[in-house]
């Protein structure tokens, strides 16, 4: 009779197509018992040719193109592009426009974090946390819509500035959303770190 030692070290391949992945990607996770010892990530399965598409457009048209790289984080792509073009052209963006770009980016970041918290909760089978985080994400999306006029591609950037301004009504709506979300995020942190699920 042949006896073997239990295999403690092994690799777990995930992807490129997997129900838990929202975008195609290949991950090779090496584990030693319960400890992840290495991870190899291979992306690029969803290459869309943005670079090639940009070659045939002008500077302004490309701003709209890069906004559509990702529906969740459209503003930050457009901001990065705008900053690059502005630096190349030697254009200085007014401080208020810089502040507005940061405000939209931070609201977008909160929206993204709540979205992915919900996705992670859903994949872990924690449907209540999924529903709560997506419900609360709507407060940020509503604030962004009231601020920029759009819920997905905010289209707030112009080369050299921004298309939107913050008035009293927008400021009040944004602060109200943030006041609502602050205790909720602390609650989510408690749920994620202490819940027995």
Which positions does each model-derived feature cover?
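Active-site bordering "gate/hinge" segments
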Residues: 1-197
